[in-house]
Amino acid sequence: MKTFWAFRETLTRNELIEPLFAIFHTALEARGMFARKGQMLDATFVEVARQRNSREDKATIKAGGVPEEWKDQPQKARQKDVDARWTKKHGERYYGDKNQVKVDSRSKLIEDFTVTAASVPDRHALEALIAEGDPVTYVNSASTGERCEKISAERNVQAKPIERAYRNKPLNGSQQRNNRARSKIRVRVEHVFATMRMCLRSAWNRCIGMTRNRATIAMTNLVYNMVRFEQIERLGLKNWRVA
C-alpha cells in the first residue's frame, strides 16, 4: 500500500496523472474505441473524511480563507480539508468532491472528466466537458436553462436533457416519451459508476485537499478505462464503426 501511495504521490506532485489519462485516451481513439454515436454527461460523489470545525472556522473556510490559529499549527492544518464542500441530494448529505464525466454511450469509456467540489451543480461542468463537434449529448435535468443552451449552440452540440416537471406544469405525452427514450441511453452511465464503486472503491477517498483528491479521481478514471478496454477486447463487444 505504501509503495502505491508513494507512486501516486510522485505522479500527483509532477502533475502527470491527467496527462497519462490523455495519452491512454489517444491510444483508445487510435483503435476506434469511441463510437461517437452519442455521449452522456453525469456526475458521482466522492466523499472524504468529514471535518470537525467550529462555526467561525467553517465560515472562514467557506469564504475561501484559512483560520488564523491553523497558521501556527501546521500539523493540524495538514489534517484539514478546506476544499471539500457539503451538499444534499434526495434527502442525503454528502461531503467531498464530485467526479463529472463525459462517457461514450456505446463503449461506456470515459472521454473526458472534470473534478469539482460536491456543491458545484452539474450544469457547471457542461462548459468544461463538451467540445466543438461532439455527438448528441444526453444530460440530466440539472443541465438545462439558457446558459446551457447557449453553450451547446456555440459548440454546435445537440443536447438532449431529461425534462423536468414543475408544479402545475406536468410533462405532456411527448415529453414523457422523450424522457423514456433518453433514460434508456443515459442509464448506461450508471454502469460506469457502479463498476467504479464496486470494483475500484471510488465512493470514498482518504486524501486531504483538492489536489490529491483530483489526482486520485483522475487515476480511478484512467484505471476504469483500462478495465473497460480489456473487457471490450476480451468479450468482443466492439460492434460499431467510428462516426
Feature-to-residue mapping (PLM):
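Polybasic low-complexity intrinsically disordered regions
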Residues: 1-154
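Amphipathic alpha-helical protein-protein interaction segments
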Residues: 47, 220-222, 226
